[in-house]
Each structure stands twice: as C-alpha cells, then as structure tokens.
Amino acid sequence: MDLGVTEIVAVNAVGAIHGDLLPGSIAVPDQLIDYSYSRDVSFYDGKLKKVHHIDFTNPYSDAIRQRILQAARTVNSRSQTGCEVMSSGVYACTQGPRLETAAEIRRLAKDGCDMVGMTGMPEASLARELEIDYASLALCVNWAAGLSEEAITLEGIHSVLEGGMQYVSAMIAEIVQHS
C-alpha cells in the first residue's frame, strides 16, 4: 500500500513525569512504552494481511527527531522568550480518555517514563508497518498526576496548549520548509 507519505511528525500533548520537563516545554522522545489496550495495533492482523513482524527497537526516526530539534533551535533563536526543549525521553502511551492516577504515574516513573500521553500508539507502529518514518513533537501541558500540588484542570491544559501551539506551529513550518 503506497500512500505517497514518507514521513510523519506527530504532535502530542503530554503530562510531565521527568523533573526537567516543565509545562509549556517541548520534548522529542526517542523511546516509548505502550500501556494502551483494545486498540487496532496492526494492519497485519491475519484478517486483511498475513501477520508481519516489524523491528520496533527504535520507534522514532532519528533523522526526523534531529530535524525537529534543529527547528526548535531555529525558532528559539528568533524568539525573545524561547522554549525549553528536552532532546530525548521515554513516552508512556496510556489508554485514556481519563487522566492517570497518582499511583499509575509513580509506576510509569519507576518504568523509566519521562512523559505520559494518550496518543502516539498504535500510530508509531502502524507507520513503521507502512515504512513511513515517524517522530513525535510532544508539548508538555501539565505535571502528571500527583507530581504537583496544583490540581489538573482542562482549563489549565487548554491554556498551556493555546500558548504552546504557537511555538509548535512555528516549528512545524520550519520543518516543512526544510524538508
């Protein structure tokens, strides 16, 4: 199946687990752990196509990740305020739509996760099945459950999203311009 697509830069909203990933900052994960369930995870499920195993050792394209990081440097150099960028990290994909419990976040931290979101899987593995390079540009919108005295509210998340998406949009424009 040729879709004419060769690369995907996914934009994900995440909660921060790692102490250096602050709300309003950007992360470019290099690994992920999938905690989701009951999602269609393959085009090769035996119904449509014969089962096919893919190497998913490195789920994100390093070439695209480097272009995202370069775009962040370029956009930061043009901005008076700039944005903090975490150049790697482990993305935990949870089921949603509810946010995680404090205990779940403690477990994710013990598992080595730096950020948590509800999107990104199975998208990353589906892209790999189709031989489409894939990377994530993650906008941190809040501290994960139990990591801040402040309650997590949708209003707070939307406020950070609104401000952060201007920066993300500038990064995407920079990536597209140099593709």
Model segments located where?
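Glycine-rich phosphate- or other oxyanion-binding loops that anchor nucleotides, phosphorylated ligands
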Residues: M1-W143, E155-S179
